């Protein structure tokens, strides 16, 4: 379950949505394929990403797959059709939108790869984190933790994380965060300036 599912449940979806099953990230077993699908067959275990664009769309081909067909229209599950919480669901452009799961990866672990990991990593890519950068990650829920991991993998020399929950701080430390800021203690920027001798940071990833 993604936090976005909770938001949809309590606050509503983007636009009018009625009688639609939630869920937009997960793993599944293929039960049937269309006649144009070449890379998958019934019985395959697959990873389903949150974004499943139409890859022949102009937006996807220009690098904006999440906006394939319109603003956030690449996010199809539980927005334009039933999501992955249903027993059976349809995946468009299967050859481009599915990934085959190796036998040695269980589905529980693999589910993290469909949205949380790539979202956090993509935030780090968009921030253009470089070797030696000091990076601030705001929010250390699942996506923020993956942003910390991504910044560490790209060679950040120092990672400062904003968050208060002890369990999240412990996990963030395991992924490479060295220092922590609490929004409960006042201005985040002032705390960061104080711990960096007024230098601030090179890159910021917003994940909260």
Q: What positions do the PLM features span?
A:
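Short N-terminal strand-loop motif that marks the start
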Residues: 1-26, 86-89, 93, 99, ...
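Glycine-rich, N-terminal phosphate-binding loop of Rossmann-like dinucleotide-binding domains
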Residues: 50, 184, 208
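Glycine-rich beta-strand-centered segment in the early N-terminal region that forms part
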Residues: 10-61, 82, 102-104
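N-terminal Rossmann-like NAD(P) cofactor-binding module of classical short-chain dehydrogenase/reductase
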Residues: 47, 202-205
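A glycine-rich helix->loop->beta "capping" turn
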Residues: 195-203
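Buried hydrophobic positions in well-ordered alpha/beta secondary-structure cores of metabolic enzymes
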Residues: 5, 28-30, 43, 57, ...
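NAD(P)H dinucleotide-binding glycine-rich loop of Rossmann-like/cofactor-binding domains
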Residues: 54-138
